[in-house]
Design a protein with these regions (language model features):
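Membrane-proximal helical "anchor" segments flanking the first transmembrane region
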Residues: 1-107, 113-115
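Catalytic core of membrane glycerolipid acyltransferases/transacylases, capturing the structured
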Residues: 103-150
């Protein structure tokens, strides 16, 4: 795990478009390299969206693997990039304006795997509370907590 964390740290120096292309390529490889997860995704889509063709399901599953891989590599920016760089890269345009949120409690939902850490950056501009589940791997748990608390 520490080697993977070191690799992520190195990747945070790359420009975002290059990091995105690498993430998409890694996701394509993961689609073929992890048949168990691919099968689970196909099963879920068959059950939830029986009207889709196999080609449509394959496209969705492939894009999921690519998006998930991109999000992991792009987290390196969120965790280690200088704050001025993050401010240039992240544009916060909330679907629910803060003025509307001040009328009472509001629950914001974020896709868990793809943008959870980006939502943490967004939380810096308005008061929010989050939920966190400790990870089994201590090195990974320490990294997630560091990245989300910075």
């Amino acid at each position: 795990m520490k080697l993977l964390i070191a690799l992520l740290w190195l990747l945070h120096w790359l420009p975002l478009p290059i990091l995105g292309r690498i993430g998409t390529a890694v996701g394509t490889l993961m689609y073929y390299a992890i048949p168990k997860r691919r099968k689970i995704a196909f099963t879920n889509l068959r059950l939830c969206m029986p009207e889709l063709s196999e080609a449509q399901r394959k496209d969705i599953v492939m894009r999921h693997f690519q998006g998930y891989s991109r999000s992991i590599l792009e987290r390196s920016l969120i965790w280690w990039a200088p704050i001025p760089r993050l401010r240039r890269l992240i544009h916060i345009e909330p679907a629910v304006p803060q003025a509307e949120m001040e009328n009472g409690p509001t629950i914001l939902l974020c896709p868990h795997f793809v943008c959870l850490d980006v939502a943490g950056v967004a939380a810096r501009v308005m008061p929010l509370s989050t939920i966190y589940s400790p990870q089994k791997n201590k090195a990974f748990d320490d990294l997630l907590r560091y990245g989300r608390e910075r």
